[in-house]
Amino acid sequence: MKTAYDVILAPVLSEKAYAGFAEGKYTFWVHPKATKTEIKNAVETAFKVKVVKVNTLHVRGKKKRLGRYLGKRPDRKKAIVQVAPGQKIEALEGLI
């Protein structure tokens, strides 16, 4: 990947993601081909925090219908990043 902003696409904004903020866990949509090491380096570079752990998962796109036409949303990749104790990502804390 080129830069941190090519790896991290957007934060996941959901109640479940907000619940992880108290434990120092932040959830992001990431590039589907990004590795855990690339995700760790991207978060550390973009938000100036120390990353302790990275968990990733693939989310399959849902099948959708528009009239008689079938379609599918794209598959995505989600990363749950845990930062060092005592640290937090200020940019995301303000979204609550």
Swiss-Prot record:
Query: Can you name a GO cellular component term?
Result: ribosome
Pfam families of this UniProt entry?
Answer: Ribosomal_L23
Going by the UniProt record, its keywords in alphabetical order are: Ribonucleoprotein, Ribosomal protein, RNA-binding, rRNA-binding
Any one GO biological process: translation
Per the UniProt entry, the disulfide pairs are none
Keyword Calcium applies: no
Molecular functions per Gene Ontology = rRNA binding; structural constituent of ribosome
User: Superkingdom of this entry's organism?
Assistant: Bacteria
Listed SUPFAM superfamilies: Ribosomal proteins S24e, L23 and L15e (SSF54189)
Protein family according to the UniProt entry:
Belongs to the universal ribosomal protein uL23 family.
Function, please? Answer: One of the early assembly proteins it binds 23S rRNA. One of the proteins that surrounds the polypeptide exit tunnel on the outside of the ribosome. Forms the main docking site for trigger factor binding to the ribosome.
User: Quaternary structure per UniProt?
Assistant: Contacts protein L29, and trigger factor when it is bound to the ribosome. Part of the 50S ribosomal subunit.
The name this protein carries in UniProt is: Large ribosomal subunit protein uL23
Q: Which gene encodes it?
A: rplW
